[in-house]
Every structure is written in C-alpha cells, then in structure tokens.
C-alpha cells in the first residue's frame, strides 16, 4: 500500500464524510537529507494560506525546511505513519489510501460509507457518523494531539449554489462542533473549517458518468504536522 510523503513535515489524513512504497519514516529521512528547502516551501504555503501573506509564509517555510534534518524528518515520518495506522485501525469500515489533497500535497485519505453521514439538504450528523467520528477522535486525534486539523465541507449539485455553499460550511462546522464538544478534541487543534459548496471540481461521479450525490455530500478532514511536532523532531524528543 502506497505511503504518503512528508512535505516539510506536512502530512494529511482526509476523512470523507459522505500501491506499495516506502514508509514515511524512510521518506522523512530522505527529505531531511536532501530536500529541506523544498519541504519548507510546503510548510510555507500552508502558513501563507492561513495568514493571507504568501511572502511571509514562504520565508517561514524556507527556514523550517532548512531546520528539518535527516533525523527530524525520520521522526516526523514515523509519527505520521503511526497516526495513519491508528486511523486505519479505528476506521475498519473505511478505506485508507494515499492521495493528493486540493493543494497537490500527498495525503492519507480515509473514506467512510457516504450513506451514514448526511442526508440530502442537511448538515446534521447522522448517528452512524457520530459513532465513527467519536472513535476517530478517541483513537487518533486525542492521542496524536500534535497534529493540526483542517476540515473541509462539500455538497452535491442538488439545490442552488448559494444554498450548497452554506450547507457545505454547515457540515464542516457540524463536524468541528462534534469533535470539540462531545469528543473533547482541543479546539486549538482544529486550525480551519471551510465550505466549498457544489464546486464542480469536487463533485463525485460514478462509473456511468453521473454524479454520485451521496458521495458528494461529505466532509474531508486533513491532519498535518504542527509546529510543535516539527520543534520536537528537531530537538530529538518526538515520540
């Protein structure tokens, strides 16, 4: 099963609420040995997007990349491998795979049964979705508290653009509220929530070329290495 790259210490897990290769530990070592600056640019891109200052983000990212050496890269890769394995164990009814997120960064995607998540036109989590999220929070987020979380909501093409944009944001907010409320995930761990509505680039289609509306109604959760994790890796204390 293909593993994902650690880009400037960045790694992602995408949960959709609707091959074989090197481990992150090995890739982290290779990254630390030769790709620090490029990896730093990946961190910088995330920082720039979050702050609205691309120039500052690039500068910060470059510095972070230089700072992440062979040992630190391996430690971050190993930690993200553990988080990935924990997600796979917690979500045995889901598919865990490597993919690229919307920014082109390699990520681990955990795909749940879309039918248990949201009903059409609704942003309320269904009972099965709550059970899956609670297990994910307990066995992954609450244990790997040094990862940052980004939540993205999506809608099917049913309804108006404006309605679906609001609906997708509501779905992302519903997931955040459940994770930070019932599941007691630290609110500061969730760095962003965003709705994309029925953006054509993100709709899901079946083999017949028609939209799979149930699959389009989803939330994606990305996990990536926090500055805390990077600092601990550089200090050699990351467990």
Give the residues covered by each predicted segment.
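Periplasmic peptidoglycan-binding/tethering modules of Gram-negative envelope proteins
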Residues: 55, 59, 73-147, 223-239
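A generic secondary-structure signal
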Residues: 49, 136-140, 178, 182
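A short, charged
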Residues: 135-166
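Generic structural signal for residues in well-ordered beta-strands
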Residues: 96, 149, 190-193
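Periplasmic OmpA-like peptidoglycan-binding domain that tethers envelope proteins to the cell wall
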Residues: 155-232, 237-239
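C-terminal motif of bacterial Sec signal peptides marking the signal peptidase cleavage site
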Residues: 15-19
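Short, low-complexity, glycine-enriched hydrophobic/amphipathic alpha-helices that associate
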Residues: 21-88
